[in-house]
Amino acid sequence: MLTRRRFLTTSVTACGLLGLQACSGETDYAEAVARIWRHSATTLDDAAARTLELVRYATLAPSSHNTQCWKFRPGGDGISILPDFDRRCPVVDPDDHHLFVSLGCAAENLIQAAAAFGQHGEARFVSAAGGSVDIALTPATAQRSPLFEAIPNRQTTRGDFDGQPLDREELGLLAQAGRGEGVQLLLLTERQAMEAMLELVIQGNTAQIRDPAFIRELKTWIRFGEAEAVALGDGLFARSSGNPALPRWLGSRMFDLFFSEQAENDKYARQVRNSAGIAVFVSAVNDAAHWMAVGRAFERFALQATALGVRTAHLNQPVELPGLRAQVSDYLGLKPGRPDLVIRFGRGAEMPRALRRPVAAVIA
């Protein structure tokens, strides 16, 4: 019988001749991480350079499967963030909900960075022509907030947390950061409530893993090795989830053999139980404008968590399936309102980083 250990041992032996290439890939990956996940090295007095740097900070926001489903259009006294529908995920996100949440996350990063560069940003959702987030920028006194400082350190951390609770002050700061107009934030820290959400997460995860279309889409966005991650600059880097970096042909084969419903459900059960709590973001109205607002609120929450040394990760399975989403609403007593995001949080080790495409690739 082919076990995971035997497969890995055989595969590593077979790949021994690729050692030098792997070392090169690791070096390129480390250089890419250092180049992407950083603060600006100099003061930016040139308006054009400052605009590009604002876009760079915006791209450090999270997006579903790290698709980076956005385009940025500078113009006049502001920047518009447009959806890139070529990077949508039609299986896991058929109504483009996560896509517009991602635009909101990028908008919040841009506004936090603009304040640090001496500009006040005001975001407005425009529904015409597929929807966009228009950010007007006006001169202001430069102010580097803790949320801005946290941008290069924020990470969707797909590892275990330490199981320790947060104190009341920390929970209060997270609650304050996650508030938004038309957005409700629920913080679940009681074990009974977390177990109830875990049951819904496992139901959703099971349904998704049994869906071949979901698996095909997920696999499309996995970057199995450093060289692939660096070349494409997007997607879910295998090492970010605690898996080994492998050439795509080998990583793909390993995924097919060992990615299983039981293993994933066991992982989520362990990770919920070693989290300090679960955050649920709820939009008052189920439309793209409010999804964008949820993205902004979540990004503030994630940045505040980062500033506190707290990590976050998504548990969105129960809000990605309509039937389970209704069960989440019923359990939490959400009438009206759409549960948009389910986030676990707690303290834990940093994982290897996902990458980003160059700024030039996202300018419309």
Regions found by a protein language model. Give the residues of each.
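Acidic, surface-exposed loops and disordered segments
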Residues: 2-364
